[in-house]
Amino acid sequence: MKLLKELLHSPLYLLQGLRYHFDGVFVTPKPRMIQFPVCDRCNARCIMCNRWQKDTATEIGIEKIREVFSSGLFSNIEDVNLHGGEPTLRRDLAEICRIIQNACPNLKRMWISTNGLGTERIEKRILEIIDVLNFGKLKALAINVSLHGLEETHDRIRGIQGGFKQSTETVRRLKKLSESYPIKLSIGTVIQPLNLYELDAMEDLARRLVVPIFFQPLMFDKFFNISGDTQLSFSEQEMETFKKVIEEKLANGISTTHFYWRDLLSMMNGSKRKSPCAFDRYVFSLYPTGEVLPCSREDWTVFGNVHDEPADKIWFGGKAKAVRQRMKKEVCPGCSFYCGVEFALQKEFFTYLRFYLKRRISDHP
């Protein structure tokens, strides 16, 4: 009876699920999520990322950003994720946030990811952002600080001596801010061989800091983090340990996050992806170079560049349509990327509903 009541409260999700399967098949919908790495500049030297090595001379300027977001293309945007590089290195980050919120009347959540290096600067930027946002419309300003292990491990992964102390101090400072301002703070940890055996300790650290922690798997692509570093390669034993961690910890539940981890485990064992993805129809990814993509997996997925043509023409153009079709055939079935999965599961609905019912029935036979 309880399960039935829960499902009866889901007509909106049902309608969204039908719309998801209509969008991208019969029509090209307006984007509903923005992924915007606002700069390649970074003050970290992470072993699993090469963005800090990129040329920053072509970083998109504030007037071009203003021009891009003057389009009506963004009227359906619900989520915005601003990252980098290190986004707080941009002095105009607050103005970027203001421009985007003004362009997105249906915006519900804004996410900002930071490496936590430079506590004073980060706190200043967040206060500047809080000052310009309209929280009457915005449900959440979410800030994620990345911590990739305990002190020695984190500093080794980050490539910055003393990085752990800086980042944990940033967490403490932002936690204090969250007591007075409407921000939601979290810690993000990328699972990799160097920190595989510290995940329990990281959860303990998060509890002491009174901040939720989220794990994600190590990923590689041609835009963010191509690396031949042997420290990033899981041994056979480490891979088995990783699978055990997923089975016993990360996939043990009924949330959309648990669904993803269970699906990833299946993919690690040879199955094709079951998780829906928002990137093939709903995500507008704008890069510091001005390039627009649906996804960062392959170099051929570039739709166009806002320095050459308007955002709406790029989004609805023939090249974008061809790229999306090719992606669905060549990339999506074997893609294990996490980004956009929870958003897509909420919109697609039916995949998660099957998972939810199966788990609830098995838990309550």
What are these regions (language model features)?
Residues 41-43, 53-54, 87, 117-118, ...:
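Short, solvent-exposed loop/turn segments at secondary-structure junctions
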